């Protein structure tokens, strides 16, 4: 349910189908998979999510890269504090998961992961509106 809230595409491509595809890829290529996990404060930073992610990581024998959420205008989600990120990372590590936290750059200028896309879309929409107004 949390995954569907964060990623509406989960309705079209459920997690189980994604995991099966990852397993097929691993068998075919014999390569390690990295799972990217975005941490959103008070949404998916609890112990229930730790346990679910441990199960997924052990099933895939993958590495997990934690990505603290970058605030995006128009969304109410919040970035977790450093202590929450560290606690989540440590909980995974103590359960045998190979885990890293993404080093980020650009958050302070709205240029980090997720932020640039919104800016690009807003700029394109504004340009389209400007052209429509000129042509009217």
Residues of each region from the PLM?
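Conserved AdoMet/S-adenosylmethionine-binding subsite of the radical SAM
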Residues: 1-95
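A structural preference for short, hydrophobic beta-strand core positions in alpha/beta folds
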Residues: 66, 101-103
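Radical SAM enzyme core and accessory elements
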Residues: 94, 104-136
């Amino acid at each position: 349910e949390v995954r569907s809230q964060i990623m509406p595409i989960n309705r079209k491509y459920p997690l189980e189908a994604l995991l099966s595809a990852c397993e097929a890829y691993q068998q075919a290529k014999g390569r390690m998979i990295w799972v990217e996990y975005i941490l959103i404060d008070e949404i998916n930073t609890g112990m229930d999510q730790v346990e679910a992610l441990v199960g997924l990581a052990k099933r895939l024998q993958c590495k997990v890269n934690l990505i603290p959420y970058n605030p995006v205008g128009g969304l109410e989600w919040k970035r977790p504090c450093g202590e929450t990120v560290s606690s989540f990372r440590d909980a995974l590590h103590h359960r045998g998961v190979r885990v890293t936290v993404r080093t980020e750059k650009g958050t302070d200028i709205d240029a980090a992961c997720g932020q640039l896309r919104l800016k690009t879309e807003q700029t394109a929409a504004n340009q389209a509106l400007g052209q429509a107004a000129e042509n009217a």
